[in-house]
């Protein structure tokens, strides 16, 4: 699943809209929307979630999704943000993403695990930023 949110004109692009998952119903919809709200609170991202379960793995689908997002970010000259698993962090840093000091907190009631946990959040600046880092 991949969820893209491109906001390069602020509120004019619907930045204040509520994330929803209209294709689900009942408890599944409620749980998914809670998860999206946790991600949404971190800020403006281009790529919120990318995964390639099962057969598509190791066929380059994830790389194609990342390349598309980086191309959009470069054309608009905006940073590209994404969350990661700890395992995926190596992949993103090899692509030039910088890990931010604050991650996305995922609530236990959303994932039904024992406690809240934090996912790393990364950013890749556009070429117009000229080696400027996000946090310093």
Swiss-Prot record:
Disulfide bonds: none annotated. Keywords: Acyltransferase, Transferase. One of its GO terms (molecular function) is acyltransferase activity. The keyword Acyltransferase applies. InterPro entries: Acyl_CoA_acyltransferase. Pathway: Siderophore biosynthesis. Probable acyltransferase; part of the gene cluster that mediates the biosynthesis of hydroxamate-containing siderophores that play a critical role in virulence via intracellular iron acquisition during macrophage infection. This is Probable acyltransferase SID5. The gene is SID5.
